[in-house]
Amino acid sequence: MREILHVQAGQCGNQIGGKFWEVMCDEHGIDATGNYVGNFHLQLERVNVYYNEASGGRYVPRAVLMDLEPGTMDSLRSGPFGKIFRPDNFVFGQNGAGNNWAKGHYTEGAELIDSVLDVVRKEAENCDCLQGFQICHSLGGGTGSGMGTLLISKIREEYPDRMMLTFSVFAVPEGSDTVVEPYNATLSVHQLVENADECMVLDNEALYDICFRTLKLTNPSFGDLNHLISTTMSGVTCCLRFPGQLNSDLRKLAVNLIPFPRLHFFMVGFAPLTSRGSQQYRSLTIPELTQQMWDARNMMCAADPRHGRYLTASAMFRGKMSTKEVDQQMINVQNKNSSYFVEWIPNNVKSSVCDIPPTGLSMSSTFMGNSTSIQEMFRRVSEQFTVMFKRKAFLHWYTGEGMDEMEFTEVRANMNDLVAEYQQYQDATAVDDHEDEDEDEAMAA
C-alpha cells in the first residue's frame, strides 16, 4: 500500500493535526479508542494509507507529534482522540522556542531532532511502500517554522525520493500574533523552496473571512478554522484512501501541478462551504460545486487569484458523479475565464474523481491551484521583513542563537527571487518564445 507518514510540529501544527485525525477517524469509521465501528467495507480497504494495524485489530494513526513545549501535546492527549495515538510518538522538549526560528532550527530544536528522526525511521520502516510525508506547521512561530523546516531538510537527506507535502499556515497580513513573524516566515520559505515538493498555503485571515462571509459564524474559533483546513487535507488524499474512477496520488499531483521546480506553493479551496444550518435546503450539482470551488472568496490564503494567472490547477471531486460532466465543467471554466490561465500550458487543469463523499455530504470538491498571484503573500511578508531588517530590529534574538546577518540577507534575496519568478511567468506569453527560438536558430546557423 502507498503509505503516508504524518508529522505535526509546534502548537499550530498539533492543533490542525488533532482536527485532521478526527476527520480521518470519522471517514474510516474508527472510534476514539482505535476500534473499527464503521459499516462499510471500503472504509477499511485502504485504511493503512494513514493507519497502522496494532494487535487486537486496533488502528493507530501513523503520526509523529513534536513540539518544544509540552502544553499543546498534553491537551491533545487529554482530548477526545488522545488515546488513539501511539504514546512513543509524542516527542517534546521542555523549554519552548519562544517564537524564535533560530531556537527551533539551530539550538533547542537541534537537540530534540534526533529523537524525532528515530520515531520517523521506526514508522517508515513499518511501511510496505512509503509514498511520502505530510507535515502540518505554521511559519509564524518558532517550533513549527524553525524545527519543522529542520525536520524537512533531515527527512530530505534520508529519503530523497519520497514526496514531501506541507500544510503551511502563513503569517496573517494584518495584526499578527507575533512581532517577529516576518523573520520566521521568510527563513522558513527559504527552506521550503529548497526541500519541500508541494506546499499547501493556508492563512488565518482568509479562513476567518470564509467563516464570517460564507459560513456566517459570528465569532469563529481556531477550532472552526482548523476544521476547514482538515476537510481540505482529507480531500487532497481521498483518492489514496478510497477507490475512484480517476485516481491521483502525491506524485501525480506534483507532476501535474508544478511546471517549474521552485514554484510549488498552491492555493487550496473546498466546496461546498455552506453555513451549518443551510445544507438541507439545497441540492448540490456539479456546476454549483465547480463555480464555488473556483470562487476567489473560497481560497484559504489571502491572495486573490484574479490578480494573477493560473499556471496549473487540480480539482478532486468526491461522490457519485459522471466523469464526463466533471470534465465538461472544467473545460467550461477554462473557456469562460481563459485570460486567467496561461496560454502556454494547454489543458492545465487536472481533475480526479473519488466515489466516496465525505461524511454528511453527497458530493464535494477540493481545489488546488498553482497561481502566480500567490506572490502577493510572499511580497507582503518580504516588505515587513525589510522594514525590520533595515533597522536590525529584534535581530539580537537570532544572532544570540548563533545566526549571522548574512543568512538574513540571503533569505531575503531568495524570497525576492521567488516573487520575481512568479511575476516573470505571469507576464510570459506564448508568442515571445517563438521569436527567441528563431533568433537562436539564426545564431546557430
From Swiss-Prot:
Question: Which molecular function terms from Gene Ontology are attached?
Answer: GTP binding; GTPase activity; metal ion binding; structural constituent of cytoskeleton
Q: Which SMART domains match?
A: Tubulin, Tubulin_C
Record-listed Mg(2+) binding positions: E69
Do the record's keywords include Ribosomal protein?
no
Stored CDD domains: beta_tubulin
Which UniProt keywords are given for this protein, alphabetically ordered? Cytoplasm, Cytoskeleton, GTP-binding, Magnesium, Metal-binding, Microtubule, Nucleotide-binding
Matching Pfam families, A to Z?
Tubulin, Tubulin_C
Q: One GO biological process from the UniProt record?
A: mitotic cell cycle
Cross-referenced InterPro entries, in alphabetical order? Beta-tubulin_BS, Beta_tubulin, Tub_FtsZ_C, Tubulin, Tubulin/FtsZ-like_C, Tubulin/FtsZ_2-layer-sand-dom, Tubulin/FtsZ_GTPase_sf, Tubulin_C
* Cofactor(s) listed: Mg(2+)
A GO CC term attached to the entry: microtubule
Q: Which family does it belong to?
A: Belongs to the tubulin family.
Under the heading PANTHER family, the entry gives: TUBULIN
Subunit organization: Dimer of alpha and beta chains. A typical microtubule is a hollow water-filled tube with an outer diameter of 25 nm and an inner diameter of 15 nM. Alpha-beta heterodimers associate head-to-tail to form protofilaments running lengthwise along the microtubule wall with the beta-tubulin subunit facing the microtubule plus end conferring a structural polarity. Microtubules usually have 13 protofilaments but different protofilament numbers can be found in some organisms and specialized cells.
Q: What is this protein called?
A: Tubulin beta-1 chain
Instruction: State the encoding gene.
Output: TUBB1
